């Protein structure tokens, strides 16, 4: 596997926008540091290419259906007795939607992952495998995955 290509794929797929990795990254998604100690390679790959297949309650989105029939899905980032605040796109943290509770017909857990499904669409099979090796290595160039 190729370390540089894996690191670049990690950047290109915008992983750090949502995921913590070492001392960098966001906190919207699961921490990817040492994730290979908790999950098998197949599960990691599946989570990258099919993020909605297995959802963690800790990171699930909420779907709010309004009385007028409109639905809004996003991460519930704030709730008061009067309002709900949703973040529909974790890559746009300033685009929060405030909803008055009196306008809400229902609120439920979404079955769709907040991780977009198309983040690796521009990557080749080899780049995806290098990305997987980079994540498994916790970003360490000396990891056995990168030794010839």
PLM regions and their residue ranges:
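C-terminal capping alpha-helices of c-type cytochrome domains
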Residues: 70-72, 76-84, 97, 108, ...
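The canonical Cys-X-X-Cys-His
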Residues: 6, 12-22, 32, 131-138
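Gly/Gly-Pro-rich "capping" loops immediately C-terminal to redox-active cysteine motifs
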Residues: 25-49, 60-109
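Electrostatic cytochrome c docking/interface patches
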Residues: 1-11, 30-33, 39-43, 67-70, ...
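Post-cleavage N-terminal segment of exported redox proteins
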Residues: 1-2, 21-24, 134-148
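An acidic site on a long C-lobe helix of protein kinase domains
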Residues: 2, 14, 123-127
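Conserved, well-folded catalytic cores of nucleic-acid-processing
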Residues: 35-38, 47-54, 134, 138-141
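Extended surface/linker regions that mediate inter-domain or inter-protein docking
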Residues: 2-9, 60, 71-72, 129-134
């Amino acid at each position: 596997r190729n370390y540089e290509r894996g690191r670049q794929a990690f950047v290109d797929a915008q992983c750090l926008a949502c995921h913590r990795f070492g001392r960098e990254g966001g906190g919207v998604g699961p921490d990817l540091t040492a994730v290979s100690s908790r999950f098998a390679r197949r599960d990691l790959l599946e989570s990258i290419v099919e993020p909605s297949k297995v959802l963690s309650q800790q990171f699930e989105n909420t779907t709010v259906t309004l009385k007028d029939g409109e639905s809004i899905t996003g991460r519930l980032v704030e709730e008061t007795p009067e309002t709900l605040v949703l973040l529909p796109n974790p890559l746009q943290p300033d685009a929060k939607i405030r909803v008055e509770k009196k306008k809400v017909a229902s609120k439920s857990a979404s079955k769709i992952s907040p991780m977009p499904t198309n983040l690796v669409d521009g990557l080749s099979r080899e780049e995806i495998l290098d990305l997987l090796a980079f994540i498994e290595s916790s970003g360490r160039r000396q990891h056995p995955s990168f030794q010839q």
